[in-house]
């Protein structure tokens, strides 16, 4: 069945293959274009550098008019990531636009890694450390990076 959402997701996948953004990759699971696996590489010169962070993107038939549900599968210590891996990111909620595609979602998440929004914390401990004790915050993030290599 070819729906608007499925056609759009196939176009997003084709674009990801033809013009992949630096440091991110994603593709649908083999038998379901509505469910994607993704990887974000931690940006250079940040505490997340060299991390390999896995995510899952779940789309429904309302995509692209409705954003996907995006969750980190990898453990993530970050002010804008809940304990269950879900993100607090404006473009996945009230700032969503149908013009965003999978590449834009992943590059936005990648830039959020080093530029958290402390005004909207999903992880209060990470937000507090980011504001008040950068050294401990970086130590915890580096542990997350090391853990990402094993998962």
Swiss-Prot record:
This is Ubiquitin-conjugating enzyme E2 2. Catalyzes the covalent attachment of ubiquitin to other proteins. Component of the histone H2B ubiquitin ligase complex (HULC) which plays a role in transcription regulation by catalyzing the monoubiquitination of histone H2B to form H2BK123ub1. H2BK123ub1 gives a specific tag for epigenetic transcriptional activation and is also a prerequisite for H3K4me and H3K79me formation. Also involved in postreplication repair of UV-damaged DNA, in N-end rule-dependent protein degradation and in sporulation. Required for obr1 ubiquitination, which regulates mating-type silencing. Disulfide bonds: none annotated. Transmembrane segments: none annotated. Residues 1-25 are annotated as: Disordered. It catalyses: S-ubiquitinyl-[E1 ubiquitin-activating enzyme]-L-cysteine + [E2 ubiquitin-conjugating enzyme]-L-cysteine = [E1 ubiquitin-activating enzyme]-L-cysteine + S-ubiquitinyl-[E2 ubiquitin-conjugating enzyme]-L-cysteine. One of its GO terms (molecular function) is ATP binding. CDD domains: UBCc_UBE2A_2B. Its main location: cytoplasm. Coiled coil: none annotated. Keywords: ATP-binding, Chromatin regulator, Cytoplasm, DNA damage, DNA repair, Nucleotide-binding, Nucleus, Sporulation, Transcription, Transcription regulation, Transferase, Ubl conjugation pathway. Its EC number is 2.3.2.23. SMART domains: UBCc. It is found in: Cytoplasm; Nucleus. GO terms for cellular component: cytosol; HULC complex; nucleus. PROSITE patterns: UBC_1, UBC_2. It comes from Schizosaccharomyces pombe (strain 972 / ATCC 24843) (Fission yeast). The active site is at 88 (glycyl thioester intermediate). Component of the histone H2B ubiquitin ligase complex (HULC) composed of at least brl1, brl2, rhp6 and shf1. Changing residue 88 to A: No derepression of transcription. Residues 4-150 form the UBC core domain. It holds the Pfam family UQ_con. GO terms for biological process: chromatin organization; DNA repair; epigenetic regulation of gene expression; negative regulation of SREBP signaling pathway; proteasome-mediated ubiquitin-dependent protein catabolic process; protein polyubiquitination; sporulation resulting in formation of a cellular spore; transcription elongation-coupled chromatin remodeling. InterPro entries: Ub_conjugating_enzyme (IPR050113), UBQ-conjugat_E2_core (IPR000608), UBQ-conjugating_AS (IPR023313), UBQ-conjugating_enzyme/RWD (IPR016135). Belongs to the ubiquitin-conjugating enzyme family.
């Amino acid at each position: 069945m070819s729906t608007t959402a499925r056609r759009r997701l196939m176009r997003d996948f084709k674009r990801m293959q033809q013009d992949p953004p630096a440091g991110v990759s994603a593709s649908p699971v083999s038998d379901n274009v509505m469910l994607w696996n993704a990887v974000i590489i931690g940006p250079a010169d940040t505490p997340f550098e060299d991390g390999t962070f896995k995510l899952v993107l779940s789309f429904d038939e309302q995509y692209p008019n409705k954003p996907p549900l995006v969750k980190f599968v990898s453990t993530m210590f970050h002010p804008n990531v809940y304990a269950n891996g879900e993100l607090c990111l404006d473009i996945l909620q009230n700032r969503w636009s149908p013009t965003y595609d999978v590449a834009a979602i992943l590059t936005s998440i990648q830039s959020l890694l080093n530029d958290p929004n402390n005004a909207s914390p999903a992880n209060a401990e990470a937000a507090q450390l980011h504001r008040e004790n950068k050294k401990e915050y970086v130590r915890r993030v580096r542990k997350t990076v090391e853990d990402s290599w094993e998962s």
